[in-house]
Amino acid sequence: MNYLPAPDRYAGKMPYNRCGKSGLLLPAISLGLWHNFGDTARFDTCQEMIRCAFDHGITHFDLANNYGPAPGAAEETFGRILQKNPQIRREELVISSKAGHEMWPGPYGNGGSRKMLITSLEQSLRRMQLDYVDIFYSHRYDPDTPLEETLQALVDIVRSGKALYAGISKYPAAEAGFAYNYLRERDVPCLVYQGRYSLFNREPEAEIIRQANQHGAGFIAFSPLAQGLLTNRYLNGIPEDSRIARPEGFLKAEQLSPEVLSKIKSLHEIATDRGQTLAEMALAWLLHNPLVTSVVIGASSADQLLNNLKAVHYPLFTDEELIAINRICL
């Protein structure tokens, strides 16, 4: 049966926010392909998630050269999905990729050198079967490469037409400030900063989010559920099929300390009183911040994606709820 995009996908299902001072609107929720789109994932499941996301107003798909497993596999999967679903029209999508983490062996497969960034983008475009990406990020600050070299590579990539906008991710505040000024002076203003931000990671509030706003850049939050801790999944221990239970996973059992578990249970009580799951409330709390342009979520199924999308129509937080949440998390 041929797939047809939902005709009402832009009829109020998803709010869109302006990204910094640019003309680009991004959905409040973006779909990240960090997990669950590698070569161990079922193609039909991946395709169903992309279709479901598009049908519900998600137009921004967040990738990187090393997303997998294996590195590059998520981009290949995404490219195959776009080829098999021409009804998901390229002009309706914002596709981002990144480079900076280890990608291939040898001295040129990691870091922020001009060679690494430009070569990586060429490979990403081939894997996704695209002529350009909308946003290309320097995925991390590389202290072993002159920052001017990394940033000039972004400038030249945008000027070449192989990316429409430049972004930075996980940069320290000092280096981010330098990047904003360098890029603006060369008429390629930084569109967006992407950083780890959640109820359990409030560090960006100290400077990063405000700094991005002051320089006219948007802010995109990733890992909004703290790698799954901010869900109902661990209320009664560690399930056998959870991320913590996997030895190769990023989340480790020691991160679920008695103190963290107590916080999870207290937040769960507030969410229940609001008529939400903990995950929905954690996402809604991020969307409550007017300086957050978009929140990147992951999903392992279309059903999980739909459950998390409920967060975009959240009930407003009361002052009492916000105080209680801060008391638990800070």
Tell what function each PLM region has:
Residues 1-93:
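N-terminal binding-site loop/beta-alpha segment at the start of enzyme catalytic domains
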Residues 2-13, 145-330:
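Beta/alpha (TIM)-barrel catalytic core signal, keyed to glycine-rich beta->alpha loops juxtaposed to Asp/Glu
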Residues 20-38, 96-109, 132, 137:
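N-terminal small/glycine-rich loop or linker at the start of catalytic domains
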Residues 27-31, 61-63, 93-97, 136-138, ...:
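Hydrophobic faces of well-ordered beta-strands that scaffold small-molecule active sites
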Residues 37-42, 66-73, 142-146, 173-174, ...:
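Acidic-and-aromatic substrate-binding clefts and catalytic sites of carbohydrate-active enzymes
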Residues 41-53, 112-128, 176-180:
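Short, acidic/polar
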Residues 41-45, 73, 77, 108-116, ...:
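Alpha-helix N-cap and loop-to-helix initiation/capping positions
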Residues 125-145:
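Active-site groove signature of glycoside hydrolases
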